[in-house]
Every structure is written in structure tokens, then in C-alpha cells.
Amino acid sequence: MDIQLKTGCFDDAALVRRVVFMDEQGYEIEFDQIDEASSCIHVTLYVDGQLAGCSRVFPEELERAADAEAPVSPACDMDEDVAAGETYIMGRVAVLPAMRRRGLASVIVEASAACARDAGAKLIKLHAQEYVLPLYAKAGYTQIAPVDYEDEGQPHAWMAKRVDGR
């Protein structure tokens, strides 16, 4: 299995997100202004040259600027010594149905964290669907708030991880 990761391939990421979040899971609002921001990093994963999954990471302040009603990440102990612009949000992690059960989501999560760290992140926060919390816990993320229903009524929880070695 030859795995390749790329950044900047929004059209491929959009295809995965449309299939997984809109067609499969029924979300109505999948794309936003964040997708168009130059500081938003779209990560795509390919297996043997075939599109398999995606994610995006971006500076936290971008979310507030794009949507005043977006869920707000809660403060946590990991925020200590993290300046404005050094907290990134990871989201839209998805793997196409035919490519699942191969550990690819873990690869995407790890690659996304590396991209955020390379862009200056010290802390990554994410608002994960409840059923995938174990995936992120295995990758070192800690739940920092109870489950909520702020994202189209679906159960999600905030998680965070320091990526600066602290």
C-alpha cells in the first residue's frame, strides 16, 4: 500500500467531504469561508494513487472571523503559554467508505498535526464527532469538554493536544 499525502488540493478534499459528510452523514453545511483562506491547510491522502481521505487545519481565529455562530473551543490547561495565532483547529477529517478500516484516518490526523506545527501551531483543538473520540485519544488528544450538540445537532466533543513538545 503506497500512501501519499498532499496539501493544497482543495478540489479533492471537497469531493471526499461531499461524499462523507453530506451524502453519507446528511450534513447540510459542509463548506465555508475558511476553505478559501490562505492560512487554511487542506490535507489529502492517496492510496496507490487513488484519493482516500482528507482534513483541514487552520488558525483558530479564522473560525471566529468566518462564522460568529461557530462552536467556540473551550479554554483548557493546555492553553498556557500559547499566544494568539498558535492554536490551530483540525477538522473535516474523513476517509472515503471504500478506503476505511486500514488505519488511514490516523495517518491523516498525524499528517495534519505536522502541517499545523510546521505552520506555527503549539496547540491543536478539534470538535470531533462522538463516535471517533477514541481515534483522537489514541493519537494523544485529550477531551477538554463534555459532549455537546452544537454542530447540526450531532454529538461532538472538544479535544486538544500540544504539538510543541511541551
Where are these regions (language model features)?
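Conserved catalytic-core motifs of GNAT/GCN5-like acyltransferases
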Residues: 125-127, 142-158
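Conserved GNAT acetyl-CoA-binding A-motif
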Residues: 109, 116-129
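Conserved acetyl-CoA-binding loop-helix of GNAT-fold acetyltransferases
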Residues: 95, 101-114
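Conserved beta-strand in the GNAT
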Residues: 44, 50-60, 65-80, 87-94
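A short beta-loop-alpha structural element at the N-terminal edge
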Residues: 1-13
